[in-house]
């Protein structure tokens, strides 16, 4: 099925580009192909369970925790650990609740907080803590409302900020690890599907990923427990991924276009700027991760056309110094991966298989 979809996508892309040229939307000059950069993917040990809609979290030990998600058999409560030294996976303790589309946030004490997601019955407000020392999970306080496809990020004070979700209220909430409880905080206006990211100035930035409007981002100040809008964004976004650049800017990617349509936020100036826009070898959405070189790796999950999603193995690198994208080695399999940068600088992609990227 993946091969047939990829063939269909290639044919569709040719027709799309031809149509755009014919209408003059891309101008009369040929579309520049993205340059090929170094970087390759290699297979590593296969997970015990192939999964999607899971979370991947780098632990202090250097191992990667994969939790929950969905398989061909349904929702998963299982979790496993990847050891970069051996390239092998080992099963660890299972969560109390099977879930996908949840969040996983590493805490300062080394534990990992998993919150929300879809369950067999409906969305959930439950949360659990993973202890790497014992390889076990324990339940903790539940959120004030169920959340799916929400955002979560660790604040400088050690609390976890959660916002958005498909059926959540506009209220954001805070998890206090010392008490194991949640409390509501400032309301996030008109945001439901939310991507959250921490900035170097200690504020959290929320991006609306409902693809409904060119909504300004929202900044959360933990000292005041308030949200304030940023300036207007250039694009409407969907399936958002973010990466904090070494210069302090935040790269935002994810759209329903068949082009590289990304932008970055400059906290110092409170402004948004667009990256180079190109429409060849496109990626509509996929995870981002910052490399040790200062560049950002984008691993393609899909390209959108006509309201439909087509799988892709395309990968690209964003270079902040030139504000441009270049192609890099393609994934071996289109599998809706997560991306995790390892301590050795390589990047682990996990979906229905596992691969390693060497910059």
Predicted regions mapped to residue ranges:
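N-terminal Sec-pathway targeting helices
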Residues: 7-15
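Kelch-like beta-propeller repeat domains
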Residues: 2-3, 14, 20-359
